[in-house]
Amino acid sequence: MTRIKRGYIARRRRTKIRLFASSFRGAHSRLTRTITQQKIRALVSAHRDRDRKKRDFRRLWITRINAVIRERGVSYSYSRLIHDLYKRQLLLNRKILAQIAISNRNCLYMISNEIIKEVDWKESTRII
């Protein structure tokens, strides 16, 4: 067998890892073994938090919509609004509704009033 020279390959791998961890504090940016452990941990946290961010924003949007809706009508809530939106087959997602609730509350009130009128009218004309 012939001899294989791979002198700089390991060094190149370690410098690449060190560049990733250059902003870490203490031994986490200096020692190779702890750098690799912290890199794995950082990537796991980033992957987990990308999913968590979606959940957190959805929760924030729901809270904002519910707060604005409950200000106007005492008996009307977020869950009834979303249910009535689906009944009327309106394509307004929670993100858009939350933006409308923050920027222009009157517009959200008009949307909810139209939905309530439409649903009440359909229920009152239904033949049993």
From Swiss-Prot:
GO CC entries: chloroplast; ribonucleoprotein complex; ribosome
InterPro entries in the record: Ribosomal_bL20, RIBOSOMAL_L20_CS, Ribosomal_protein_bL20_C
Sample GO molecular function, one term: structural constituent of ribosome
Keyword hit for Nucleotide-binding: no
PROSITE patterns in alphabetical order: RIBOSOMAL_L20
Segments crossing the lipid bilayer: none
Subcellular location: Plastid, Chloroplast
Any GO BP annotation: translation
Cited Pfam families: Ribosomal_L20
UniProt keyword Signal, yes or no: no
Protein family according to the UniProt entry: Belongs to the bacterial ribosomal protein bL20 family.
Name of protein: Large ribosomal subunit protein bL20c
Source organism (scientific name): Nicotiana tabacum (Common tobacco)
Gene (name only): rpl20
